[in-house]
């Protein structure tokens, strides 16, 4: 009997497909519209079988290198953003032309980490992608490199694809790149590197050494593994497969490494708190509060707080840290930082009536 986790990929009715930069370029780094068209063929076959697909496509910077007369991928931010602004046009035009052969229309959705982090923008992006699918258009998502700052070096869209997968309620995430799957070491450097066909828990990752990205993109194995684990933890199974085998990956999931999803899908709010929202500050907890919050899933009371850091307001997301400064949870705080600074360490009975709510309610708290 085949793997039930691969079966989950194969039978998924809604899939996010992430296409990495190296899947869209020649070995010398030149953007290759022909390779993109081949991937579109494989994706079209899956859609023709009745699956909704959203594409997260890297490659804007790479697509802008040749038109701007650059000899290699730029290193400075301004030139990266200039290349992205030129390359994004070529990238979307190529996807549009590829799917036009099948009578399909594409829609471009450019996001930054900030868009995903802010609840209103997060919801707007979700509605846009849902409406594109309802109108039978193919959503092409990319990071908005022309306005991103440090995000432009952030995972070659690996993390973004995991966030989008949960955002649209996808049944599966397929990561396509030049990587065969997960190994316990770099197979290009170590002949005895062991291929890992399935990851069902932390024990499967013992001894795994993940490398960084290529000169063409920014998403190395570390980024892909982290993003796959993020999606799987949220309840979305993931297949990490080579773009050269896209047809097999999207047809029967017989290639690459599959990451098993947790049995219960994380709610949209808890996912946003845990993974998408930007932290506005932190609270340091004593040992008793850590046990209550993490071990017993109880609300955080002011009495268990020993330090307040950051300028945050009620409704913001903050990190909850143990006495050793290790983050143990994240949550939506009920008070401003200035209020909590006067409340911390005090029992509820000592506080005025209007300040007797938990600092972070259990319903707004997610252990990490």
Curated annotation (Swiss-Prot):
InterPro entries: AceGlu_kinase-like_sf, Asp/Glu/Uridylate_kinase, G5K_ProB, Glu/AcGlu_kinase, Glu_5kinase, Glu_5kinase/COase_Synthase, Glutamate_5-kinase_CS, PUA. The keyword Electron transport does not apply. It catalyses: L-glutamate + ATP = L-glutamyl 5-phosphate + ADP. GO terms for biological process: L-proline biosynthetic process. Its EC number is 2.7.2.11. Pathway: Amino-acid biosynthesis; L-proline biosynthesis; L-glutamate 5-semialdehyde from L-glutamate: step 1/2. Keywords: Amino-acid biosynthesis, ATP-binding, Cytoplasm, Kinase, Nucleotide-binding, Proline biosynthesis, Transferase. Disulfide bonds: none annotated. Substrate binds at residues 58, 145, 157. It is found in: Cytoplasm. ATP binds at residues 18, 177-178, 218-224. Pfam families: AA_kinase, PUA. The keyword Cell membrane does not apply. GO terms for cellular component: cytosol. Its main location: cytoplasm. Residues 280-358 form the PUA domain. One of its GO terms (molecular function) is glutamate 5-kinase activity. Belongs to the glutamate 5-kinase family. Catalyzes the transfer of a phosphate group to glutamate to form L-glutamate 5-phosphate. This is Glutamate 5-kinase. It comes from Mycobacterium marinum (strain ATCC BAA-535 / M).
């Amino acid at each position: 009997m085949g793997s039930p986790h691969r079966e989950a990929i194969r039978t998924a009715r809604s899939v996010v497909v992430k296409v990495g930069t190296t899947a869209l370029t020649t070995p010398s780094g030149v953007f290759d519209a022909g390779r993109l068209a081949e991937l579109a063929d494989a994706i079209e076959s899956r859609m023709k079988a009745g699956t909704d697909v959203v594409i997260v496509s890297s490659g804007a910077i790479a697509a802008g290198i040749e038109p701007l007369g650059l000899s290699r991928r730029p290193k400075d931010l301004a030139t990266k953003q200039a290349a992205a602004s030129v390359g994004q046009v070529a990238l979307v035009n190529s996807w549009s032309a590829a799917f036009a052969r099948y009578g399909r229309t594409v829609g471009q959705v450019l996001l930054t980490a900030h868009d995903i982090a802010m609840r209103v923008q997060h919801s707007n992006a979700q509605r846009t992608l849902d409406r594109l699918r309802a109108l039978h258009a193919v959503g092409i998502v990319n990071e908005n490199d022309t306005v991103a700052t440090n995000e432009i070096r952030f995972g070659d869209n690996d993390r973004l694809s995991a966030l989008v997968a949960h955002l649209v309620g996808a049944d599966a995430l397929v990561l396509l790149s030049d990587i065969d799957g997960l190994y316990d070491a770099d197979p290009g450097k170590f002949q005895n590197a062991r291929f890992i066909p399935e990851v069902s828990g932390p024990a499967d990752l013992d001894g795994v050494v993940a490398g960084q990205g290529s000169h063409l993109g920014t998403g190395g194995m570390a980024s892909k593994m982290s993003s796959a684990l993020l999606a799987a933890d949220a309840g979305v199974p993931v297949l990490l497969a080579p773009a050269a085998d896209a047809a097999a990956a999207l047809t029967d999931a017989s290639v690459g490494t599959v990451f098993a999803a947790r049995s219960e899908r994380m709610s949209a709010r808890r996912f946003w708190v845990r993974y998408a929202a930007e932290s506005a500050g932190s609270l340091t907890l004593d040992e008793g509060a850590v046990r209550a919050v993490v071990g017993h899933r109880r609300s955080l009371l002011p009495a268990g707080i020993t330090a307040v850091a950051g300028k945050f307001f009620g409704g913001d997301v903050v990190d909850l840290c143990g006495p050793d400064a290790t983050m143990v949870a994240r949550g939506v705080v009920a008070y401003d930082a200035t209020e909590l600074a006067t409340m911390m360490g005090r029992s509820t009975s000592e506080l005025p009536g209007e300040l007797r709510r938990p600092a972070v309610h259990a319903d707004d708290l997610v252990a990490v």
